[in-house]
């Protein structure tokens, strides 16, 4: 289990992991790592929250929120933000399904992708600032948001098909079973309930689950399935929806 966690941490983040801790795991078994997603999100969110707390006293709430969002993006190498941009470029191109997938594979940033990045990043900064001004615990909120967003991404993997013939997303999409999905969502719910007691966190997770489920169905209808890019988009939007639900 520990090797699986380190392998997933190395796979979906840019945090330094000693190679000997993550080596030796068959790539075909990576799908089992979905259950570690909420824990990895918890770690990323906690680090981002600590950055906010450390900078708030010196720079004020808005700049602390800016740097916490920046650190979160850097820890993932902008991987999920890139997926969000590619997904929006493809889906909003109003082309055929095959052409949408081609556009999503293009490394160049389009207008829709750029607008999506600006909106989501700016929205996160504003929501974090508002939560802080309302006296909400930012460390717990960010940790829970990152855990839940990565946990609910399982909804785009279970009983979904991969829209391409090959790609990194194929490691998870259509490969996880009902038990793994329930365990992943259960862990995310536990983290949300513990970090944000009084059902506040659980209620925000329910809202996030509904939003991600609807997103998954819309993407399935539009693209014929999911890709690694759509998983990244779901994680980014899941974080934002969860934080908005806390307001």
UniProtKB/Swiss-Prot annotation:
Names of the cofactor(s):
Mg(2+)
Q: Name one Pfam family in it.
A: CobS
> What residue ranges are annotated as transmembrane?
34-54, 59-79, 113-133, 138-158, 194-214
User: How does the UniProt record describe the way this protein sits in the membrane?
Assistant: Multi-pass membrane protein
> Which compartments is it annotated to reside in?
Cell inner membrane
Q: Which InterPro entries match?
A: CobS
Alphabetic keyword roster: Cell inner membrane, Cell membrane, Cobalamin biosynthesis, Magnesium, Membrane, Transferase, Transmembrane, Transmembrane helix
Pathway assignment reads: Cofactor biosynthesis; adenosylcobalamin biosynthesis; adenosylcobalamin from cob(II)yrinate a,c-diamide: step 7/7
Glycoprotein as UniProt keyword: no
GO molecular function terms noted in the UniProt entry: adenosylcobinamide-GDP ribazoletransferase activity; cobalamin 5'-phosphate synthase activity
One GO CC term, this protein: plasma membrane
Q: Which reaction does it catalyse?
A: alpha-ribazole + adenosylcob(III)inamide-GDP = adenosylcob(III)alamin + GMP + H(+); alpha-ribazole 5'-phosphate + adenosylcob(III)inamide-GDP = adenosylcob(III)alamin 5'-phosphate + GMP + H(+)
- Please give the biological process terms from Gene Ontology that the record holds: cobalamin biosynthetic process
Stated EC number for the protein is: 2.7.8.26
- Assigned protein family: Belongs to the CobS family.
Q: What does this protein do?
A: Joins adenosylcobinamide-GDP and alpha-ribazole to generate adenosylcobalamin (Ado-cobalamin). Also synthesizes adenosylcobalamin 5'-phosphate from adenosylcobinamide-GDP and alpha-ribazole 5'-phosphate.
HAMAP family in the record, alphabetically? CobS (MF_00719)
What's the protein called, per UniProt?
A: Adenosylcobinamide-GDP ribazoletransferase
**Native species of this protein?**
Escherichia coli O17:K52:H18 (strain UMN026 / ExPEC)
């Amino acid at each position: 289990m520990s090797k699986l966690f380190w392998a997933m941490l190395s796979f979906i983040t840019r945090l330094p992991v000693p190679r000997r801790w993550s080596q030796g795991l068959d790539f075909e078994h990576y799908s089992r790592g979905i259950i570690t997603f909420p824990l990895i999100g918890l770690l990323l969110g906690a680090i981002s929250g600590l950055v906010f707390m450390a900078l708030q006293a010196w720079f004020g709430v808005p700049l602390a929120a800016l740097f916490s969002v920046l650190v979160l993006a850097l820890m993932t190498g902008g991987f999920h933000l890139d997926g969000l941009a590619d997904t929006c470029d493809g889906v909003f191109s109003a082309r055929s399904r095959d052409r949408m997938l081609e556009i999503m594979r293009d490394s160049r940033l389009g207008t829709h992708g750029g607008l999506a990045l600006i909106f989501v990043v700016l929205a996160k900064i504003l929501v974090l600032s508002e939560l802080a001004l309302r006296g909400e615990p930012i460390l717990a909120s960010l940790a829970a948001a990152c855990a839940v967003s990565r946990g609910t991404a399982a909804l785009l993997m279970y009983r979904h098909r991969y829209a391409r013939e090959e790609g990194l997303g194929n490691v998870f999409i259509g490969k996880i079973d009902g038990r793994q999905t329930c365990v992943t969502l259960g862990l995310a719910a536990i983290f949300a309930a513990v970090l944000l007691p009084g059902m506040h966190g659980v209620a925000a997770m329910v809202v996030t689950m509904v939003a991600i489920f609807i997103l998954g169905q819309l993407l399935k209808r539009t693209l014929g399935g999911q890709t690694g890019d759509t998983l990244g988009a779901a994680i980014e939007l899941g974080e934002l929806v969860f934080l908005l639900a806390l307001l």
